[in-house]
Each structure stands twice: as structure tokens, then as C-alpha cells.
Regions:
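A recurrent domain-boundary module in secreted/ectodomain proteins
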Residues: 164-203
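Eukaryotic low-complexity intrinsically disordered regions
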Residues: 159-161
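Catalytic nucleophile loop of clan PA
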Residues: 19-31, 36-47, 72-76, 80, ...
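Short beta-strand-to-coil "C-cap" segments at the C-terminal boundary of structured domains/repeats
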Residues: 41-44, 152-154, 189-196
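Terminal export signals
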Residues: 76-103, 109-118, 193-207
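Secretome/extracellular-domain signature
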Residues: 1-91
Length: 207
């Protein structure tokens, strides 16, 4: 929450939409960047490197940012499509990302795209959530759109120049939107299904 009259600018983590220059007010308005995605990718580098984004095989979508005001729909992330962020009057909305495109809103400047969310701007502006395709941001949607999740399978959508091969395909998958059984957005939990063998560590001194 900004101090009255202070202009702030916040960037988002791993695809989340940041907040452009925003001037807080004595009314206590505040805006939040979107939540970042968590992903497993095969090629490293900067988070927004296109080649790296095109190597993602699992993505947990982040939730859209919130302005703290009333709303009809919270932009949870994850699942095959992120939830839309909708204001209480349904006058403004920020769409969630899907498997095929980023979230859309009334102004294309705030639309989400592949791996990059729409930014927020203005009073109560909000950023979209990071994801496979990211959510839209807005200057007054009260909640940004959530980013979509992704799991690579034989039948999953694969954009042009997508690099992982069939040896990385998953089966028997379940993609869940945040805010349901998980109660959270944009996180990954790794469970060890088989005990690792004991490791023998040897050391030596070179002369």
C-alpha cells in the first residue's frame, strides 16, 4: 500500500503483470501486481527469454492482482483457463489466460500474452497473473485475470517452435484452478514417490 501522494512502480515475478506508475491517495486505494507462475522448464536463462518459455513442460498459473475493493470474480490462476477478474458492477473485467491465448480486456494495452501478463495502471489498477498464457491487467478491474496452467501431454497445445519432445509427455494428469482444493495459486508441490538410494560420497586430496 503506497504512502499518500507517493508514486510507485512494482514489477511482477515470473510473468506476473506489474504496476505502472501509480499515485496513492488519502482514500487508501492501493493496487497489486499479479502473482507469479511456478514452472518447470528445460532451458534456462532469463524468465522472459522466449526460447526458455517455449521449453516449459509444467506451469502452475498465478492469480491476478487485487485492488482491495469489491468484486464479483477473483482471478484465480491455474487449470486449463485462469479465472476472469470482474468488478462488482461487472463494468470492467480482466480475462484469464487459456491454453491458446492470453487474457483479454477492454484495452489491448493490458492484455496478457504467452508467458507475460498485462500490467496494471491507474487508481486500483491491477496486474494479471503469470502462467502458460497470462492473465490481463487493468486500470480499474479490481482483480486481474489469472494465468493458465499447463501440463505437456500428447494432446496438449504446443505453440510454434515449442521445443520439448515426446519423451517428456505426462499422462493421467489433473490440472486444478487455485482457490479450490489447493486454496492457493501459482505454486508447485513435488512429492517423492520412491525413496532415493543411499549416496556414497568419496573425497580425496590431490597433491
Amino acid at each position: 500500500k503506497g504512502v499518500n501522494g507517493i508514486e510507485t512502480c512494482r514489477s511482477g515475478f515470473n510473468g506476473a503483470g506489474g504496476i505502472n506508475t501509480y499515485k496513492s491517495t488519502s482514500d487508501g486505494y492501493y493496487s497489486l501486481a499479479g502473482g507469479g507462475a511456478t514452472d518447470i522448464r528445460l532451458i534456462g536463462g532469463n524468465w522472459d527469454n522466449l526460447q526458455s518459455l517455449l521449453s516449459r513442460i509444467i506451469v502452475a498459473g498465478g492469480g491476478g492482482g487485487g485492488s482491495g475493493n469489491s468484486h464479483d470474480s477473483i482471478g484465480h490462476g491455474g487449470g486449463t483457463k485462469g479465472k476472469d477478474g470482474i468488478s462488482i458492477a461487472n463494468k470492467y473485467f480482466a480475462g484469464g489466460g487459456s491454453q491458446f491465448q492470453g487474457g483479454l480486456t477492454f484495452n489491448s494495452l493490458y492484455n496478457g500474452s504467452f508467458g507475460v501478463s498485462g500490467a496494471g495502471d491507474g487508481i486500483s489498477g491491477v496486474g494479471g497473473g503469470g502462467g502458460w498464457y497470462c492473465g490481463a491487467g487493468s486500470f480499474y478491474a479490481e482483480f486481474g485475470g489469472g494465468g493458465s496452467g499447463y501440463i505437456l501431454t500428447k494432446d496438449s497445445y504446443k505453440p510454434a517452435n515449442y521445443s520439448p519432445s515426446s519423451k517428456y509427455y505426462f499422462s493421467d494428469i489433473n490440472s486444478v484452478v487455485g482457490g479450490n482444493t489447493t486454496k492457493q495459486d501459482g505454486y508447485a508441490k513435488i512429492t517423492l514417490l520412491q525413496a532415493l538410494p543411499f549416496l556414497t560420497i568419496s573425497s580425496y586430496n590431490s597433491t
